[in-house]
From Swiss-Prot:
Associates with TFIID-IIA (DA complex) to form TFIID-IIA-IIB (DAB-complex) which is then recognized by polymerase II. The keyword Ribonucleoprotein does not apply. Sequence repeats lie at residues 115-192, 216-290. General factor that plays a major role in the activation of eukaryotic genes transcribed by RNA polymerase II. This is Transcription initiation factor IIB-2. It holds the Pfam family TFIIB. CDD domains: CYCLIN_TFIIB_rpt1. GO terms for cellular component: cytoplasm; nucleus.
């Protein structure tokens, strides 16, 4: 339930929404505050079709302000029966021949949604990626570019701007074959185009090593205690001038924390889980090593334990 102002009660009260009638009713006096309202969110139920065709859901998705018609299109389905199949398929062909200026956007948005779902990203990131793609597409300058890389780069930038960054390698894993280099080039192109549009530098958000820590630790199956120690350590590492990328620092901290525990992880496994090369992890470890006594929590490891670590 939500709150709304009731003219009879003369104050805000809890209201109940009657889905069958479309009425919003005051829960205290029963006054209908709004009638015949339309729910624009997508339907939560789906009705399976045994014929193997698409599920015949009764309504489409929610309205989309990025599309010219708000996403409120009509699709001609195939009813049962041979004559019906012939009629509907003919109408369907004519419908497909009709001009739909949003067809390309719809396909792009579906691709972005699929990639985002595979990475477990929230709806706000999908919406931001859609918005970025629409702004670039409106400039009519992306023709001929790798579409998969472009969409993946939109998702990467959206993650950064929503303070939920993903590594390029993570984005690459769901990018339908686009390489890290192609996504990197597409990202630079998008940032340049958006900068030309607004006349300002595009805000990408700041990446911190801690942004990746919990996800990396989860990939390695680390215990809650080691995860906590890793998070505290990586946060403490920001106080020092360690000129390495946040992802490299996160990987090196995980290596150190696991070496101090009974659940030691091979460098190879950490490299696979984080996407950071083994050599890069070693170099980051070398930079962190002089500061370990101030970075590693005292409750997790004693000074003697730190001295037993391998010298870089």
């Amino acid at each position: 339930m939500s709150d709304a102002f009731c003219s009879d009660c003369k104050r805000h009260t809890e209201v109940v929404f009657d889905h069958s009638a479309g009425d919003t009713v005051c829960s205290e006096c029963g006054l209908v505050l709004e009638s015949h309202s339309i729910d624009e969110t997508s339907e939560w139920r789906t009705f399976a079709n045994e014929s193997g065709d698409n599920d015949p859901v009764r309504v489409g998705g929610p309205t989309n302000p990025l599309l010219a018609d708000g996403g409120l299109t009509t699709v001609i389905s195939k009813p049962n029966g041979s004559s019906g199949d012939f009629l509907s398929s003919s109408l369907g062909r004519w419908q497909n021949r009709g001009s739909n200026p949003d067809r390309g956007l719809i396909v792009a948005f579906k691709t972005i949604a699929t990639m985002a779902d595979r990475l477990g990203l929230v709806a706000t990131i999908k919406d931001r990626a859609n918005e970025i793609y629409k702004r670039v597409e409106d400039q009519k300058s992306s023709r001929g570019r790798n579409q998969d890389a472009l969409l993946a780069a939109c998702l990467y930038i959206a993650c950064r701007q929503e303070d939920k960054p993903r590594t390029v390698k993570e984005i690459c894993s769901v990018a339908n074959g686009a390489t890290k280099k192609e996504i990197g080039r597409a990202k630079e192109y998008i940032v340049k185009q958006l900068g030309l549009e607004t006349g300002q530098l595009v805000e990408m958000g700041t990446i911190h090593a801690g942004d990746f820590m919990r996800r990396f630790c989860s990939n390695l199956g680390m215990t809650n205690q080691t995860v906590k120690a890793a998070q505290e350590s990586v946060q403490k590492s920001e106080e020092f001038d360690i000129r390495r990328s946040p992802i490299s620092i996160a990987a090196a901290v995980i290596y150190i924390i696991t070496q101090l525990s009974d659940e030691k992880k091979p460098l190879r496994d950490i490299s696979v889980a984080t996407g950071v090369a083994e050599g890069t992890i070693r170099n980051s470890y070398k930079d962190l090593y002089p500061h370990l006594s101030k970075i590693i929590p005292a409750w997790y490891a004693k000074e003697e334990d730190l001295k037993n670590l391998q010298s870089p």
